[in-house]
Each structure stands twice: as structure tokens, then as C-alpha cells.
């Protein structure tokens, strides 16, 4: 029997929602704790674009293998947008840890985009796994540890997407 070019998997809505929630749930608290001043809409747009990419390629079985190479290409392009400024970003991160909260503001949009792409890609991997509850719980604990280590006061609302993704991923 010939495979169709486009078929919608039964679990697509759950996987897409979980992917999006993991991306937003990781990037939003990290952005707040790092003092990144990029608008939340940039994060939502990047997470939505990666989620849409994975959802569309899940519907096309013959092209499904292109999802991660395309994501890696986008991450590489985002990292190249910093063009040799990695040492400056590292120095700004060191200054931020030592009490200069506005040190990373100059790199806010690039870092928000990079974090959104990376964490939504991780979310896409975790949302498609049957045993994703414990890795997702470990990711949430690590995120809480990083946020508390940075000493930032973030609202509880920024943690809700990741908690909801944890509950959805446990099904």
C-alpha cells in the first residue's frame, strides 16, 4: 500500500501544545532571571515557528527527517548573529552574576531567539517520547535551580507553561 504524502497523526495537537509549552516555559523564566529585555512576543513567535515546523513535518512522513537539520540550521544562524561576540556575551554574563543586572541587555534579542530555538527543539524531542516525564521533570528542576541561583524574583506565572507541559507529558 502506498503511503500518503500528507497525513495528520492522531497525537499531533498534544505534541504541538507540549512542544510550545516546553519552549515558552523554559525561555520565559530564564529571560526574566537573566534580565533580558527582549519582548515576550519574540519568544512566542520563535517557539511557535519551531512548533509549526515540527507539526508540519510530522504530517509529512517522507520529509519528517528534515525537522532536526532545519532546526540546527536555524540555531546555527542565530548563533552566527552574535558574530564573534561570544567572549563579550560571556563577560556580560559574568557581570550579571556579580550584580550588574543590565549587562546582557545589549544581547537580549539574540539570546532570547537562541534560547527559544534550543528549548523548543528540546521540547519537540521530549513531547514525542513516551517516557518523557522524568527528563521533563529534571529539566524543570534544573531550570528552578538556575533561576534561584541567579537570585531573580520572577512571577509564578512564568513557571506555569512548563508545569502544564509536565502534566501533559505525563499522559
Question: Where in the sequence are the language-model features?
Answer:
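Linear, non-domain "peripheral" regions
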Residues: 1-171
Amino acid at each position: 500500500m502506498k503511503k500518503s504524502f500528507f497525513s495528520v497523526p492522531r497525537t499531533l495537537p498534544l505534541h504541538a501544545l507540549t512542544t510550545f509549552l516546553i519552549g515558552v516555559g523554559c525561555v520565559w523564566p530564564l529571560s526574566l532571571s537573566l534580565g533580558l529585555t527582549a519582548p515576550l512576543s519574540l519568544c512566542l513567535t520563535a517557539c511557535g515557528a519551531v512548533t509549526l515546523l515540527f507539526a508540519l513535518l510530522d504530517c509529512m512522513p517522507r520529509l519528517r527527517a528534515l525537522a532536526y537539520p532545519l532546526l540546527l540550521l536555524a540555531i546555527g544562524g542565530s548563533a552566527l548573529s552574535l558574530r564573534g561576540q561570544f567572549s563579550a556575551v560571556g563577560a556580560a554574563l559574568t557581570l550579571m552574576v556579580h550584580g550588574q543586572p543590565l549587562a546582557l541587555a545589549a544581547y537580549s534579542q539574540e539570546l532570547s531567539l537562541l534560547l527559544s530555538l534550543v528549548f523548543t527543539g528540546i521540547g519537540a524531542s521530549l513531547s514525542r517520547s513516551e517516557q518523557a516525564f522524568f527528563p521533563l521533570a529534571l529539566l524543570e528542576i534544573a531550570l528552578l535551580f538556575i533561576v534561584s541561583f541567579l537570585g531573580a524574583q520572577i512571577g509564578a506565572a512564568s513557571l506555569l507553561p512548563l508545569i502544564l507541559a509536565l502534566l501533559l507529558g505525563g499522559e
